[in-house]
Amino acid sequence: MLKPFVSITKPGIIFGNLISVAGGFFLASQGSVDGGLFLATVIGIALVIASGCVFNNYIDRDIDRLMERTQGRVTVQGLIPPGVTLAYGGVLGVAGFSVLWFGTNALATAFALLGFVVYVGLYSLYLKRHSIYGTLVGSLSGAAPPVVGYCAVSGQFDLGALTLLLIFCLWQMPHSYAIAIFRFHDYRAASIPVLPVERGVRAAKHHIFWYILAFLGATLMLTLGGYAGYGYFAVAAAMGLYWLVMALRGYRAGDDQVWAKKVFIFSIFTITALSIMMSIDFQVTETEVLMTSLR
């Protein structure tokens, strides 16, 4: 009875995002962790992400029927009525934003709202189906959680928060393009205009390489900017360089789908490792404020 209501929130996506939230939170905490604030941040953003996933499942129920990997989803199988799905998503969203508003600060809540609006309002409702740039715009929603975690502590949008936003936006691109390559036939069957389908797999390989290169540079900026230590720097450099080598191997890959799946899997290891390292290898620093919380 309850299983469909859990499944529709995409627990795996929530868990993955909470790792990045924790990374941003502990990076900003600089060793002085407020347990209550951490709990409010994690619960609030988890509920917001769950809400976004529920709405995404509702919106995508027609194209999910056409894709092999999504044909078993709750909304496709009719396990939860559409009206109940919408109400459920709404309740989760209100609960999540309320927890963030009362438990953290306005700036953290604003970035959570930005991510939600981009994911549900821009990406899911329109860009995913109509534009090759859907992945690019959607990357902003995937980059919001670590910034929420960071701003929940700092109450300000500084260069550290900006660097996190850049890192996670850049990471989303090769991660998503790799999915689109090894699930190429699904995306083509559903007429979703992702880059590999619209411009070809080789063009996507070019983009994957350059985005990983940019991602590598962005990750190192956390140390060069004085926010993370050299342990983080070493891990970021090693993971980024190996991911870059994997991208180069794609030009000689005998099976693009096998290669892309490896790139995708390693992307998860990479971002998880960086989130953990920034949590434990932080630097205490004075930062230049770009934006402060309203309260």
Curated annotation (Swiss-Prot):
Reactions that this protein is recorded to catalyse: heme b + (2E,6E)-farnesyl diphosphate + H2O = Fe(II)-heme o + diphosphate
Any one cellular-component term (Gene Ontology): plasma membrane
Pathway(s) served: Porphyrin-containing compound metabolism; heme O biosynthesis; heme O from protoheme: step 1/1
Example of a GO biological process term: heme O biosynthetic process
Transmembrane portions of the chain: 8-28, 35-55, 83-103, 107-127, 132-152, 162-182, 208-228, 229-249, 263-283
CDD domains cross-referenced by the UniProt entry: PT_UbiA_Cox10
EC numbers: 2.5.1.141
Cysteines joined through disulfide linkages: none
Protein topology in the membrane: Multi-pass membrane protein
Keywords: Cell inner membrane, Cell membrane, Heme biosynthesis, Membrane, Transferase, Transmembrane, Transmembrane helix
Pfam families attached to this UniProt entry: UbiA
Functional summary from the UniProt entry: Converts heme B (protoheme IX) to heme O by substitution of the vinyl group on carbon 2 of heme B porphyrin ring with a hydroxyethyl farnesyl side group.
Classification via HAMAP family: CyoE_CtaB
Full protein name: Protoheme IX farnesyltransferase
Organism: Chromohalobacter salexigens (strain ATCC BAA-138 / DSM 3043 / CIP 106854 / NCIMB 13768 / 1H11)
